[in-house]
Every structure is written in structure tokens, then in C-alpha cells.
């Protein structure tokens, strides 16, 4: 295994930058520029020197001995002053060592996976934590990073292995008198796992939305005040406003952190019958995007006909209430009236949905669990048909186990790993 190094903190000027080495020669390489290393898992200040003996910087140095490190290998970290010049010079000094090379994107984390320090779901949790912008995203990523999904998968896997073992034992002793009927226990195990997996699958949509952001479509007729409201919510001129109906033709998006929840407001084209071909295309897009959104806010009077059928949680508000003297209900993008109440209602709706979120956070997780459910359904069907179909039951159970194992990376999937790690920076 090569020894690799990279900048482990953000690129650019900073108070402190972290440079990480990992691999069998990490300690030897580090000693060439800092002299003696501190004891494992302890820190010490060292002077870093180039090959010609010139001083590069003073650094805080930490050393970790395998397997007690992030990667499971020997690791050394240099915490240097965050000057671009200092970082570049340290990296150049490390490059001068023939036994070390610059790490590829995500290579440190990949080594942690290969050495059993993380499972695949934890790797994805780490990536999500790095990308987290809101509190809900951070909490969700931490749950996965700390191994909660992997622990749940292991419980499912253990139960299915027990069920498969019972079936296999019955097959092996088919010609002998087996005193115990395994069907009740196997049935109970399959029902337990199937129920848990279905619950987890049901929560994946919300989990994926926490990662990408809940979408809220502003829907209404032309000149209903949608763009003005969007600009008020954004605190800037995100959309063009005009007294001319049909100004908005493309869907305009504004992302926000709403009480820790990631949301995206969509300003859609005004809905009406139009002879303008370009506007008609915009209206068709608006209807499609609004129907796909997680929530719709209809800006329309109580007697107006809606071109999109509202769903249970959708919100309907009278727009431009600033033009109706004495009105206490509705909303105004111009004055801000009704906006706090709207945001609280939206936050309440999504908070209730988030309460049902599971641990599976990626589409890959959902697809793997759906495959496992199909295999479990097939195995249960074969089980009920009697002992002569136990070989099919065992085969389907093994398929279900393999599907669940892909969640945590027990099954080799080189292309999948390449895709996941390509999203990491060099220092991870």
C-alpha cells in the first residue's frame, strides 16, 4: 500500500491548515521534515524543514499508530499556519520523498473503509456531514456517520442468517425425522425483518428531501404576487416583477434555511389559458414542477378556480392583502403581512414529516431495501408452499441478505465506490 498525503482542510488562506499523511511509510516520511515524532495520539510542536535544511514553519504535529487512526494505518498530521505559501512548501517537501505521493480524491476515507474503520453507509454519512448546510442535514448525517444504519442492517442480517440456517438444516436432514417444525420461527423472523425494512423504506423520501431540500411551489394566476413574495422571502430581487401578466416563464428557485430545515421556494409561471406559445410552455412546466413539489402555496382568492388540485397539507392564501384595506387574512409580498405565519405553517408541516424519517438517506439505500423486500416476499411465499420448496426459500433468503449487505459495503462494488469517493476532496 502506498503512503499518501494531502491537504486535509479547506483550500486557501486560513488561520490553521491540516496536512495529513497515511500509509506504511508515513512516520518515516514525516520524520524527514520534522525530526522526531511525538508519542502516538499525543501532540507536540516541531520545526518543519525542507531538504536543504531551511525552515518552512513551526507546526503542531500529531502521530497515530495503526490501527488506531482514521484510516486504520500509520497517520501523521501537520497543523501548520494556514498560509498558501506554507501549505505549498510543505506539500512540495513531502513530494520530494520517493515513497509518498499525493492522495486521490477520497482516498483517506476509502482506506478507512477497506480497513474496517467505516462501513459504506458511514462513508456516505461523512460526505453528507461535510455538505450539510442546515441543522436537520447535520443531525441526519451524524446519525448515519455514527453507524446507526449499519447497526440496524446487522440486526436484519443476523435474523435472516438464522432463518436461512434453519431452512438449510431442514433440507440437509430431509431424509431423517426432524422433531421441530422450523416454519413458525422462520415465519416470525421474516415478518420482523420485512416490517422493519418497509418502515425504513417509507422514510427514505423524507430523508432524501432533507439532503436535497423540500420544495415549495408558489402557484397562482398571472400577477398574483408570486414573484414579489419570492423576492420578499429571499431578501433580494431573485425574480423580475412587473404589472405585465406572464412576466415569469421559467421556474425560479430560492433556497432557504427554515428553522433548520432546507427548503427551496419555486416561483412558477402564472397559470392561465394563453395563446403565446412560449408562455404556454412555461405554464406546462409550472404545473409539472408544482405537482412534483413537496408543498404548494396557492395565491388565489377564495372563489378562484384552481388549475391544480390541492393536496391535504397545501396552503391557500389571498394575495396582495395590502390592496384590501382592513383585511386581516392573506399575504402581501410588498408589505410582508402574513409571511411569518406562512413560514411557521410550512415549518410545522415539514417538521411533522421529518419526525417519520428513517436512517436510509440515499436512493441507493432505498433501492437495495426494495430488492431485499422482493426477495423476502418470494422466500415467504415459497416457505408457505411447504418443505418441498425450502430450497427456493433458502435461495431467496440468501438474495435478501446480499441486498442488505450492499447497504454497508459488504458486497464488492468497485464502480459504486469510485462514484462515492469522487465527491470527496483530496484530504478526505
UniProtKB/Swiss-Prot annotation:
Predominant location category: cytoplasm
Xref: PROSITE patterns: G_TRME (PS51709)
Annotated GTP binding sites: 223-228, 242-248, 267-270
Subunit structure: Homodimer. Heterotetramer of two MnmE and two MnmG subunits.
Gene, per the UniProt record: mnmE
Listed cofactors: K(+)
Positions bound to K(+): 223, 242, 244, 247
Function: Exhibits a very high intrinsic GTPase hydrolysis rate. Involved in the addition of a carboxymethylaminomethyl (cmnm) group at the wobble position (U34) of certain tRNAs, forming tRNA-cmnm(5)s(2)U34.
Binding locations of Mg(2+): 227, 248
InterPro entries, per the entry: G_TrmE, GTP-bd, GTP-bd_TrmE_N, GTPase_MnmE, MnmE_dom2, MnmE_helical, P-loop_NTPase, Small_GTP-bd
Keyword set, alphabetical order: Cytoplasm, GTP-binding, Hydrolase, Magnesium, Metal-binding, Nucleotide-binding, Potassium, tRNA processing
Lineage: Bacteria, Pseudomonadati, Pseudomonadota, Alphaproteobacteria, Rhodobacterales
EC number(s) reported in the record: 3.6.-.-
GO MF term list: GTP binding; GTPase activity; metal ion binding
CDD domains named among the record's database cross-references: trmE, TrmE_N
TrmE-type G domain location: 213-351
Record flagged with keyword Transmembrane helix: no
Pfam family, one: MMR_HSR1
Binding note for cofactor: Binds 1 potassium ion per subunit.
Subcellular location: Cytoplasm
Record's keyword annotation contains Metal-binding: yes
GO cellular component, one term: cytoplasm
Ligand binding ((6S)-5-formyl-5,6,7,8-tetrahydrofolate): 20, 77, 117, 428
Superkingdom as given in the UniProt entry: Bacteria
GO biological process: tRNA methylation; tRNA wobble uridine modification
Protein name (database record): tRNA modification GTPase MnmE
Amino acid at each position: 500500500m502506498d503512503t499518501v498525503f494531502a491537504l486535509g482542510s479547506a483550500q486557501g488562506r486560513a488561520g490553521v491548515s491540516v496536512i495529513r499523511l497515511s500509509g506504511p511509510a508515513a512516520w518515516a516520511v514525516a520524520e524527514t521534515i520534522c525530526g522526531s515524532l511525538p508519542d502516538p495520539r499525543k501532540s507536540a510542536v516541531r520545526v518543519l524543514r525542507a531538504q536543504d535544511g531551511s525552515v518552512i514553519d513551526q507546526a503542531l504535529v500529531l502521530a497515530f499508530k495503526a490501527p488506531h487512526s482514521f484510516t486504520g494505518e500509520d497517520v501523521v498530521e501537520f497543523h501548520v499556519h494556514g498560509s498558501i505559501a506554507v501549505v505549498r512548501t510543505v506539500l512540495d517537501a513531502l513530494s520530494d520523498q520517493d515513497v509518498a505521493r499525493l492522495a486521490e480524491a477520497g482516498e483517506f476515507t476509502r482506506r478507512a473503509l477497506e480497513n474496517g474503520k467505516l462501513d459504506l453507509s458511514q462513508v456516505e454519512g461523512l460526505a453528507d456531514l461535510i455538505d450539510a448546510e442546515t441543522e436537520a442535514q447535520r443531525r441526519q448525517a451524524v446519525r448515519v456517520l455514527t453507524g446507526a444504519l449499519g447497526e440496524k442492517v446487522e440486526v436484519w442480517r443476523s435474523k435472516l442468517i438464522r432463518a436461512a440456517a434453519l431452512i438449510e438444516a431442514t433440507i440437509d436432514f430431509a431424509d431423517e425425522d426432524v422433531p421441530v417444525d422450523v416454519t413458525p420461527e422462520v415465519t416470525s423472523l421474516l415478518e420482523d425483518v420485512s416490517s422493519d425494512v418497509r418502515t425504513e423504506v417509507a422514510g427514505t423520501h423524507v430523508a432524501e428531501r432533507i439532503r436535497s431540500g423540500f420544495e415549495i411551489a408558489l402557484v397562482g394566476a398571472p400577477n398574483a404576487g408570486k414573484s414579489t413574495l419570492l423576492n420578499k422571502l429571499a431578501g433580494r430581487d431573485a425574480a423580475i416583477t412587473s404589472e405585465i401578466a406572464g412576466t415569469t416563464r421559467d421556474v425560479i428557485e430560492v433556497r432557504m434555511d427554515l428553522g433548520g430545515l432546507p427548503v427551496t421556494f419555486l416561483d412558477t409561471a402564472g397559470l392561465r389559458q394563453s395563446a403565446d406559445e412560449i408562455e404556454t410552455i412555461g405554464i406546462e412546466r409550472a404545473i409539472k414542477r408544482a405537482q412534483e413539489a413537496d408543498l404548494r402555496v396557492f395565491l388565489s382568492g377564495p372563489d378562484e378556480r384552481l388549475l391544480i388540485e390541492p393536496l391535504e397539507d397545501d396552503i391557500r392564501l389571498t394575495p396582495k392583502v395590502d390592496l384590501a384595506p382592513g383585511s386581516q387574512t392573506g399575504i402581501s409580498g410588498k408589505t410582508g403581512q402574513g409571511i411569518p405565519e406562512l413560514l411557521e405553517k410550512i415549518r410545522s408541516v415539514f417538521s411533522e414529516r421529518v419526525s417519520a424519517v428513517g436512517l436510509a438517506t440515499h436512493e441507493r439505500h432505498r433501492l437495495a431495501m426494495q430488492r431485499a423486500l422482493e426477495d423476502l416476499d418470494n422466500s415467504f411465499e415459497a416457505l408457505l408452499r411447504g418443505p418441498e420448496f425450502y430450497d427456493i426459500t433458502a435461495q431467496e433468503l440468501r438474495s435478501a441478505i446480499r441486498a442488505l449487505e450492499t447497504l454497508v459495503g459488504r458486497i464488492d462494488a468497485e464502480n459504486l465506490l469510485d462514484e462515492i469517493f469522487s465527491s470527496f476532496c483530496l484530504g478526505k
